[in-house]
């Protein structure tokens, strides 16, 4: 839909501004569609910026449990509900082989320090908030 497309276009513009300023950027959005991911990959290539995809792997039952728990506790800060989850599960397109080569898979039991370590293995310097060239 148009609102969804506008969101991705805006995120791409913001990412470009941050990258052009010489910093790393995290674009935190679902990227369900290959086209959405391809546009960001093109931006990274255009700016000679490294790209890492954080591929969060959570079982569907666990996703449903989390949504239900947040709804029960009344602490949900997102628009996530079962309808949104059903849509996302139906619409998601798996990572291509090329995208998987760029991906770090993150499981529910993956500790943040492990993600940081794996990013540093790819050249990310958290003290500089950027990848080493």
Where are these regions (language model features)?
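Short glycine-/polar-rich loops that comprise or flank the Walker A/P-loop
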Residues: 23, 47-52, 97-103
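Glycine-/small-residue-rich active-site loops that bind phosphorylated ligands and cofactors
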Residues: 32, 59, 111
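Short, hinge-like loop/turn segments at secondary-structure boundaries
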Residues: 44, 70-73
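Conserved phosphate-donor/acceptor-positioning beta-strand/loop module used by diverse small-molecule
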Residues: 46-67, 106
